[in-house]
């Protein structure tokens, strides 16, 4: 059996209990060495075989899974954050399906959640934004037509941009082609929840210059939107006038 497990954003204690239990139990761990905190490997059994997928191709990763299955051994495929976001897990699952190998998924805390925690921020503030766009800038890997950053920026919603910090000049230009202005709040979160975490608060207008001045070139998220400003509306749910299934308010 193969278990796809989300490692969380960085801090080892942010992996789920289920994920930690699987790491302690399996015969083999294949981990994304470029992003997963190696401290998590300390949970593995002494006889656990460990592979760093940063040095492997899809075919090599799949071959290890297949060999383990033939030997009646269980494997954890350990991905950073939550595997459902930029985890490249579908192509692995398709191979396992073709070979008749069973697998399951254990979710993890995504780095975009870790970034919000680092900023003490709420992405969906009443009266500000009720939509979160998770995307990335097109680079060596293209994006589908209609999903270019400038087009998505036209919504003016809260935006979380993965895998794009090395293209920060292009990111800033694309954001300014949309609904954001030079005064729109933004932030860069480097290695959210890791000991070396860094926070950079800025505006869309100063995003590129401040990021470059800070020397941040990889392993960082860009977040944009007025959720980072001071203004918002009080929630209806906890308003004394608002009636819910569990509480009668002053208004029906």
How should these model regions be labeled?
Residues 16-17, 34, 126-128, 183, ...:
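Non-catalytic, surface-exposed connector residues within folded enzymatic/regulatory domains
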């Amino acid at each position: 059996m193969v278990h796809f497990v989300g490692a969380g954003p960085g801090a080892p204690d942010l992996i789920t209990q289920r994920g930690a239990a699987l790491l302690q139990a399996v015969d083999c761990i294949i981990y994304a060495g470029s992003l997963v905190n190696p401290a998590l490997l300390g949970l593995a059994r002494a006889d656990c075989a460990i592979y760093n997928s940063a040095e492997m191709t899809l075919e090599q990763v799949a071959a290890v899974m297949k060999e383990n299955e033939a030997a009646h051994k269980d494997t954890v495929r350990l991905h950073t954050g939550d595997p459902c976001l930029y985890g490249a897990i579908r192509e692995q699952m398709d191979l396992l399906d073709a070979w008749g190998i069973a697998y399951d998924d254990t979710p993890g805390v995504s780095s975009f959640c870790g970034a919000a925690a680092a900023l003490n921020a709420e992405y969906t503030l009443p009266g500000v934004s009720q939509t979160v766009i998770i995307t990335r800038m097109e680079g060596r890997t293209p994006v589908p037509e209609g999903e270019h950053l400038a087009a998505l920026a036209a919504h003016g919603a809260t935006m979380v941009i993965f895998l794009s910090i090395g293209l920060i000049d292009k990111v800033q230009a694309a954001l300014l082609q949309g609904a954001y202005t030079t005064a729109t709040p933004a932030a860069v979160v480097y290695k959210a929840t890791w000991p070396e975490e860094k926070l950079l608060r800025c505006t869309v207008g100063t995003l590129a210059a401040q990021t470059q001045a800070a020397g941040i070139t990889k392993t960082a998220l860009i977040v944009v939107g007025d959720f980072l400003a001071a203004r918002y509306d009080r929630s209806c749910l906890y308003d004394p006038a608002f009636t819910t299934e569990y509480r009668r308010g002053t208004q029906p």
